[in-house]
Amino acid sequence: LRFVIPLFIPRFPLPAILAALVLDAADQTIFQQFTNLNLDGYQNYDKALDIFYLTIAFLAVYRNWTNTTAINVARFLWYYRLVGVWLFEVFQQRWILFVFPNTFEYFFIAYAAIRTQWDPRRLTHRAVIGLAAFIWIFIKLPQEWWIHIAQNDFTDFMKVDVFGTTPTTSWADAITNRPAVTFALIAA
């Protein structure tokens, strides 16, 4: 699926990138739960698959976007992260991914969401840069710290802190442990 879903990004940018994002977030957990695969090199092939779907998203920027400033910001964010992934591959230091956050992905999502309701050509230079800065500072830096510095796992967090179970609890048991939380998450 991580090879197929991204192919829909140029035609259906928002739903396809969101599906790719969810698959990216869930694949390690799926592999851990349902296979006996050795996941020692997971970070490396995960980054390669990220580059694959984000490359398609980057190409979709040129195909679909109409705001020149947003295109230029997306280009910078894309290449900045690409340099970071390359440095990570060379040095195998997780902090590098914190310094070079994947702001491009969420910027793409924000632009695609804006595009569903408004004409993005109306976004000012200041608004585009402000949006990218907001995503970088308040969303991506904390998230990259959580993943690459603290090395926390989102699925473990959900099971322990949201559903009140242990990380090894099955998802079926975790969800049934707190049905009100499950209902609230679905309703949101």
Range-by-range predicted roles:
Residues 1-4, 26, 30, 48-56, ...:
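Membrane-embedded alpha-helical segments of multi-pass membrane proteins
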Residues 115, 121, 138-154:
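Hydrophobic alpha-helical transmembrane segments in multi-pass integral membrane proteins
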Residues 122-131:
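Membrane-interfacial entry segments at the cytosolic side of transmembrane helices
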